[in-house]
Amino acid sequence: MPTYRSKTSTAGRNMAGARSLWRATGMKDDDFSKPIIAVVNSFTQFVPGHVHLKDLGQLVAREIEAAGGVAKEFNTIAVDDGIAMGHDGMLYSLPSRDIIADSVEYMVNAHCADAMVCISNCDKITPGMLMAAMRLNIPVIFVSGGPMEAGKTRLANPVTKTIELKKLDLVDAMVIAADQSYSDADVAEVERSACPTCGSCSGMFTANSMNCLTEALGLSLPGNGTVVATHADREQLFKRAGRRIVELTRQYYEQDDVRVLPRSVGFNAFENAMTLDIAMGGSTNTILHLLAIAREAGIDFTMRDIDRLSRVVPQLCKVAPNTNKYHIEDVHRAGGIMAILGELDRAGRLHTDVPTVHAPTLKDALDQWDIVRTQDEAVRKFYLAGPAGVPTQIAFSQDTRWPSLDLDRAEGCIRSYEHAFSKEGGLAVLTGNIALDGCVVKTAGVDESILVFEGSAHVTESQDEAVENILNDKVKAGDVVIVRYEGPKGGPGMQEMLYPTSYIKSKGLGKACALLTDGRFSGGTSGLSIGHCSPEAAAGGAIGLVRDGDRIRIDIPNRTIDVLVSDEELARRREEQNAKGWKPAQPRPRKVSAALKAYAKLVMSADKGAVRDLSLLDD
């Protein structure tokens, strides 16, 4: 039988000093016989997805203590990718994932906590906490702050001149700002309307993608990824998480039930998560994060598995930025993640024998929570939770409900296998002589007319240079914009490229250009945007050998990407580049701190999840 970890600092005569300090935090005599559960919060006033979390840690703590545990809350950092984007602040975003994982490990191990409730929400916080959960392998439940409501405003269509009601998100603000056909007044109106409430940005961007994937991994409660942050129903997720973690903790330490440990989800749960991601056209960043989380779990889940799944999993859901018709709030109305998993199950694409934190198996969970098969009216009411359309930073501030569920599996937000948006899913892995270890593309956001594309390389060696060239009309129809030396090592930090892709769209080139980078993309990116090119330029990858004017051929159906240059010429260029060193031809006006240099020294390639190369730490 496992021993409670907390006994290390709470039991025995020699721990009198530690107990004295525990007492100074408010613990009483009878608390020393209870499990100590860490409430891992991520409140910050910098990030709309986290601005409402301040009191939610204590909400969970009260439920833990009512259920017989001792709750101790601490915070991690949280970077807002949207605010950090487009300048050197983005260098810190991906590295913050590892800092978050480390900080959770440090706090939980230093104080010998028995279990965790992780309160996450935005882009790097959920994956960082998931990495920590797998590393620590103690009972855990994830509960997110929830998605933002979609914005809405009335704008004049620049083509038809008619006034239209437009649903909005962050990406719309970026695209319209660079589109000269819209007036300054229009831009100001969109700016004020695009992000109306607290919560993670309202489309299927990275934050919401990752929060949805926690449901597929079996580590969060149903609705975690889709109930809007403002709705009263989300409060129940926090309360249930607080009560349930005490039960899971006792199952492990008092009944030796290892099924409640996060690593017990196994390889099949990672396949389920990736299958969901492909089916819903999630962010390409999820690939990076799932690879990293699997490595922390000691699970051999690789790009090969992702490539295999991408060829057979259909796309059953299409949400912004891949369409303006639906946002996360609409996914919830259609039954949320459990509904997508239910359709995947009926298509024979799901492992349903994996454990979850709220049901013995995923099959049991689907029997209750898939609205197509459930008989539970409370579940149906739960998925009617909708947006109120009232700007606010206050959680649980409204209880609006949709008039009806979206059960249309032929033309609705979530489709059945027979009516899939496409028979192949929303993400793909491409390989070729320019990306020997692979690169990724969100096919859900690519127009069918450019699934096969050949164009002329327009080479840039920083995101800033790419943005400048796009805005100054140096990028033309038929170009493949190369943005290199922006990978995990080369950036360092693997910047997101939402501004270049948004500006390509605003210039009317969204169906006429491609962009290839060893950096990565925001979950808000759409178009022929190919990232994670591995090996990266700074590690000697062939993307560093491409020259202006080289022809590049992209074939998504056949999963290939090649620079149309002979092997002999590439070998000659490689010798030349080896002599020069694998770095930008011209110095970049970029401040790289000691912290970022340390990150670059240890980080591995994107196809390995951009995690630390632990072999470098061996004696």
Swiss-Prot record:
- In its keyword annotation, does this UniProt entry include Transferase? no
Cross-referenced Gene3D superfamilies, in alphabetical order?
IlvD/EDD C-terminal domain-like
Provide GO CC annotations from the record.
Answer: cytosol
At the top level, the lineage of the source is Bacteria
Q: How is the cofactor bound?
A: Binds 1 [2Fe-2S] cluster per subunit. This cluster acts as a Lewis acid cofactor.
Chain positions recorded as Mg(2+) binding sites: 81, 123-124, 496
Which PROSITE patterns does the entry mention?
A: ILVD_EDD_1, ILVD_EDD_2
Record's subunit section: Homodimer.
In its UniProt entry, what is this protein called?
Answer: Dihydroxy-acid dehydratase
* Organism of derivation: Burkholderia vietnamiensis (strain G4 / LMG 22486) (Burkholderia cepacia (strain R1808))
